[in-house]
Amino acid sequence: MANRIKKGDQVVVNAGKDKGKQGEVVRVDGDRVVVANVNIVKRHTKPNPQAGVAGGVVEREASIHISNVNVLNPASGKGERVGFKVLEDGRKLRVFRSSGEALDA
């Protein structure tokens, strides 16, 4: 099944502690997404000299459930729901549900 949200999409968080924040999708892992500079958590890491990792407290982005983000519509400046439209040649095209405007070129 095709995902409604893809890597590189600009999204808006619509639930949780970071509600209202915008960012770019860095990674999609099944039903979870990692958004740049959103849901920052502190991880306590052990030093690993072989990998060149210094130990300590590291801040990084944690994943968010895909249902808690909406794709940013550049026309309206708001996060909106995305659906699919099947073209005559059988390809699926992502479209905004509110306007029917195509998301992909």
Curated annotation (Swiss-Prot):
The keyword Membrane does not apply. One of its GO terms (molecular function) is rRNA binding. It comes from the Bacteria. One of its GO terms (biological process) is translation. Keywords: Ribonucleoprotein, Ribosomal protein, RNA-binding, rRNA-binding. One of its GO terms (cellular component) is ribonucleoprotein complex. InterPro entries: KOW (IPR005824), Rib_uL2_dom2 (IPR014722), Ribosomal_uL24 (IPR003256), Ribosomal_uL24_KOW (IPR041988), Translation_prot_SH3-like_sf (IPR008991). PANTHER family: MITOCHONDRIAL RIBOSOMAL PROTEIN L24. One of two assembly initiator proteins, it binds directly to the 5'-end of the 23S rRNA, where it nucleates assembly of the 50S subunit. One of the proteins that surrounds the polypeptide exit tunnel on the outside of the subunit. Part of the 50S ribosomal subunit. Belongs to the universal ribosomal protein uL24 family. This is Large ribosomal subunit protein uL24. It comes from Stenotrophomonas maltophilia (strain K279a).
